[in-house]
């Protein structure tokens, strides 16, 4: 970099190796953080001089008015200017720190528009993570917790995945009985809609082979009618009433700290938590007060918290640029990854299984009317085409009876669509939020849908073809949250084994990048303050070791995140 005499003492030039490996690079430029970092609400620019400038970068701005740039300036928590290296260098004064990016790539901060961040964080602290590749490993992990737990007390595992086990079969209650004959145990699927309960847990709940399935749930049985221990959807309610809360307020705060560290390490700068109660709201506030919340949050209230907010006159959008109230969350059917979503045609190999509904049409109408008339954006979990139709019926009804411009109601997951559904979504101005890492990560599950359905599942290309602002969604823990994996998944439609699912739904890298940034901001009414590297917007950005355009599409997920910056401050950096 040519030194600027005016600020030569503040110039920084780094080789790629040094930039990646040194924590002093951006820290020296005024964007490093102390051990506990506080995200603050936006402050106005106080002077023309930028705090620091980043030069000689490959900036993918995701701003249609200026798609690429070489450099940008940051003042406070905002982008002060974006342009060529020469122009941005000329803005620097003697107090401005100068960073030479040496040709590395910069993107806007990534946004996850559907995640369960706080719950995932605290689960890591209080439950047994069984994201393992064999039943033997799962049993060993559970055994350690059982050994430390008094007889009769519950043991809980989470993040179980039935299709990634070396034994080639799912976990069942008899496996768990072998290591926990005297403790009730539940192992939750990472999809969040099923769990495997051992025999003691079933007995405590009074569940036998003769227990009928509820309309909105299922107790699974083998071919001989014997309970396997797998329980789906609302059939789990009987257990929820028995399992005591196992987390403290401090653990929930620490869970937010942990998950925000993990997610910013992956390049996420904003998350929309779909579904949260009072404890989640307190956890985010506590973590923020402690300086331990590294990303921006939009919380989707549900249940009693939603009722309390309505009674207090709060609506979607209340809050600031760090934490705000988002849409209200409801859930109307089963899971794509657990193969319980409600469809108009059956699952492959299960001719009588169409999936599970968890809300009736009347219940959806009632919930949507209440939320819509109280000024809330709405996000309803609806995976299957049957359920999506039901949700659209409700959205169309309320907009006909009580029109509200630009309501941006959402369909969370919106997994299986059709041309008719796409036309209705477009006409209603609804935002779909399909899984963005599912095709790549959950490939072994798609055989139960088949290629015909997969041509219309997680249909990012079709949404874009219909000019629908499709949002980015991991649903973590059900799907991995890493946005670079999301880019790869949407671009290639390949699973871990290289199988292609629904190749007609492939999109370009630039389209995928926009989904993960600008479309994410649009989904929460924040497109004017973030989602692109644009003058005046929040300085949320990510520095990548390589440009996704330059690597093999099958290797995008392996690109190194060098640094994640939120509001001008470094939240992750080597």
Residue ranges of each PLM-predicted region?
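Signal peptide processing junction and immediate N-terminal pro/mature segment
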Residues: 35-43
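Non-cysteine beta-strand/loop elements that form the S-adenosyl-L-methionine
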Residues: 323-339, 430-438
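Acidic (Asp/Glu)-rich catalytic clusters
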Residues: 288, 316-319, 426-427
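Divalent metal-binding segments
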Residues: 22, 26-30, 42-55, 60, ...
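His/Asp/Glu-enriched, well-ordered alpha-helical/loop segment
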Residues: 368-379, 383-409, 413-414, 419-423, ...
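N-terminal secretory signal peptides
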Residues: 1-18, 25-29
